[in-house]
Swiss-Prot record:
This is Hyphal wall protein 1. Keywords: Cell adhesion, Cell wall, Glycoprotein, GPI-anchor, Lipoprotein, Membrane, Repeat, Secreted, Signal, Virulence. Residues 1-27 form the signal peptide. It comes from Candida albicans (strain SC5314 / ATCC MYA-2876) (Yeast). Sequence repeats lie at residues 46-58, 59-69, 70-81, 82-91, 92-101, 102-111, 112-121, 122-131, 132-141, 142-151, 152-161, 162-171, 172-179, 180-187. It is a lipid-anchor; GPI-anchor.
Length: 634
């Protein structure tokens, strides 16, 4: 069957008309998609077809107006005006020609250096001065007189002969050092000594007198040794018998001065030796020898040597309260030597500090008890409140009583008295409680009520443990509410401490007072926001339609404890909100998981993909129909 041209044109027109309606389906789908977006996310995105109209009509039209009228017009006004001010500034440099007038004064100043030519005439007087140094050649003749002076030091060679006599000196003090008392050393500078001036005359005479006849004669030898640092100044007497050196000093002459001490050795008889200056005329020609008397007592009494030293009187002036008083203090050293040597030294004290000690009371009974009273301090405490002050006295001190056992008691004043009957509510330490599915309803989040203290809490409560409540077990909680805690009457000794409770979304929470068996079957949508997924040990899967909200509320302690050891995966159904409940004082940080939120009001419009798929299917269907009709007609 063949069709006419008119029929073919009509069929083609019909086909084109059918094909023209297909984009309307796409446009309808885009419009409905925009409506869905507006309902779900509260914003509306305009179709892409509207952008060309905005760019061509509104935006391009605004820019020519701004660039051509406002902005370019302002610059010509600002720039020409500012440069116009610069020609006025060159007027300031016009003042500089006036300043060069000041340098005109400098030609006048060079006239002053013109006065210097007369000054060079003054240095001309210096040539006569070089003639003055010419007088110095006679001065070198003066040092020529020094050659006779070296002849004077030539007289010194006889002087080295004098130090030649000194070698015996170092040998002399070694024998006398142990016999010299050390107490005399500070008195050495007080008495001047006269050195011997005649070293060439040896001492050969010694006069010794004995008060009584003795069976053994004393032989005296006079070697050239001396008892001091001056050579040939004193003569020691030595005998083969045992010697006891005794010295009685009649003057304050130090022991190290020459001719001051002469040791005397005697046998069993009493021997007194007196050395005078007349008996040894050659030893000390220019100094006087003090008389040294040595007495040896009988052998039955111990020998005692008493030496009197110089004493010093110190005047101490003490001033206090504008009044000064003077006191004399005598200082010195007294040494008494017997079988035992005792040294007593007196040192004045500048300040006297009284020391007071309380006597210890001792009981005569078998147990020894000592009570010591320490000094007490009275402290006045002034307390002010509401414009009124009160004073109170507090006595502090320490009392120590020692018996068989030592007990220390210390009193310390307290600044504030805290009554011991105060008790802190223990609502922040509720026991860990796992709520099974459908066991207890919770309260909406966002409402905060104070926790009631427990009446009985054992001391063996453990650390906080996260609490997981299965999904769909409780009515949903709107985010931001806090449920109050209900006091617990009796808790066993093995209950755990506060634990964060994880409540699945989609359930409504009410105060956990008495348990109720109301099923949790009321899902309610939650506004979109930041969702938090619980970070627990078990794997928790939440679909896109669920929203997690964070809630902080103290747990409602109950008498029923469900097993909390199950770590299986918790599956949260769609259209549910997982609410994280942190109980006690231990916050729980939850991991944020962005989820999709469906529209609050369900729309009868299908998703965009449905319309896109429908459009594509319609195009394919119409194309196949057209091809079939064309093939059928041809």
């Amino acid at each position: 069957m063949r069709l006419s041209t008119a029929q073919l044109i009509a069929i083609a027109y019909y086909m084109l008309s059918i094909g023209a309606t297909v984009p309307q389906v796409d446009g309808q789908g885009e419009t409905e998609e925009a409506l869905i977006q507006k309902r779900s996310y509260d914003y509306y995105q305009e179709p892409c077809d509207d952008y060309p109209q905005q760019q061509q009509q509104q935006e391009p039209c605004d820019y020519p107006q701004q660039q051509q009228q406002e902005e370019p017009c302002d610059y010509p006004q600002q720039q020409p005006q500012e440069p116009c001010d610069y020609p006025q500034q060159p007027q300031e440099p016009c003042d500089y020609p006036q300043q060069p007038q000041e340098p005109c004064d400098y030609p006048q100043q060079p006239q002053e250096p013109c006065d210097n030519p007369p000054q060079p005439d003054v240095p001309c007087d210096n040539p006569p001065q070089p003639d003055v140094p010419c007088d110095n050649p006679p001065q070198p003749d003066v040092p020529c007189d020094n050659p006779p002076q070296p002849d004077v030091p030539c007289d010194n060679p006889p002087q080295p002969d004098q130090p030649d006599d000194n070698p015996p000196i170092p040998n002399i003090p070694t024998d006398w050092i142990p016999n010299i008392p050390t107490d005399w050393i500070p008195d050495i500078p007080e008495k001047p000594t006269t050195p011997a001036t005649t070293p060439n005359i040896p001492a050969t005479t010694t006069t010794s007198e004995s008060s009584s006849s003795s069976s053994s004669s004393s032989s005296s030898t006079t070697p050239k040794t001396s008892a001091s640092t001056t050579p040939e100044s004193s003569v020691p007497a030595t005998t083969p018998n045992t010697s006891v050196p005794t010295t009685s000093s009649e003057s304050t002459t130090p022991a190290t001065s020459p001719e001051s001490s002469v040791p005397v050795t005697s046998g069993s008889s009493i021997l007194a030796t007196t050395s005078e200056s007349s008996s040894a005329p050659a030893t000390t020609p220019n100094t006087s020898v003090p008389t040294t008397t040595t007495e040896a007592k009988s052998s039955s009494t111990p020998l005692t040597t008493t030496t009197e030293h110089d004493t010093t009187v110190v005047t101490v002036t003490s001033c206090s309260n504008s009044v000064c008083t003077e006191s004399e203090v005598t200082t010195g050293v007294i040494v008494i030597t017997s079988k035992d040597t005792i040294y007593t030294t007196y040192c004045p004290l500048t300040e006297t500090t009284p020391v007071s000690t309380a006597p210890a009371t001792e009981t005569p009974t078998g147990t020894v008890s000592t009570s010591t009273e320490q000094s007490t301090t009275v402290i006045t405490v002034t307390s002010c409140s509401e414009s009124s002050c009160t004073e109170s006295e507090v006595t502090t001190g320490v009392v120590v009583v020692t018996s068989e056992e030592t007990v220390y008691t210390t009193f310390c004043p307290l600044t504030e008295n805290t009554p011991g009957t105060d008790s802190t509510p223990e609502a922040s330490i509720p026991p860990m409680e796992t709520i099974p599915a459908g066991s207890e309803p919770s309260m909406p989040a966002g409402e905060t009520s104070p926790a009631v203290p427990k009446s009985d809490v054992p001391a063996t409560e453990s650390a906080p443990v996260p609490e997981m409540t299965p999904a769909g077990s409780q009515p949903s909680i709107p985010a931001g509410e806090t449920s109050p805690a209900v006091p617990k009457s009796d808790v066993s000794a093995t209950e755990s401490a506060p634990a964060p409770e994880m409540t699945p979304a989609g359930t409504e929470t009410k105060p956990a007072a008495p348990k109720s068996s109301a099923p949790a079957t009321e899902p309610s949508p939650v506004a979109p926001g930041t969702e938090s997924a619980p970070a627990g040990p078990g794997a928790s899967s939440s679909p896109k339609s669920s929203v997690l909200a964070s809630e902080t509320s103290p747990i409602a302690p109950g008498a029923e404890t469900a097993p909390a050891g199950s770590s299986g995966a918790i599956t949260i159904p769609e259209s549910s909100a997982v609410v994280s409940t942190t109980e006690g004082a231990i916050p729980t940080t939850l991991e944020s998981v962005p989820l999709m939120q469906p529209s609050a009001n369900y729309s009868s419009v299908a998703p965009i993909s449905t319309f896109e798929g429908a459009g594509n299917n319609m195009r394919l269907t119409f194309g196949a129909a057209i091809i079939g009709i064309a093939a059928f007609l041809i």
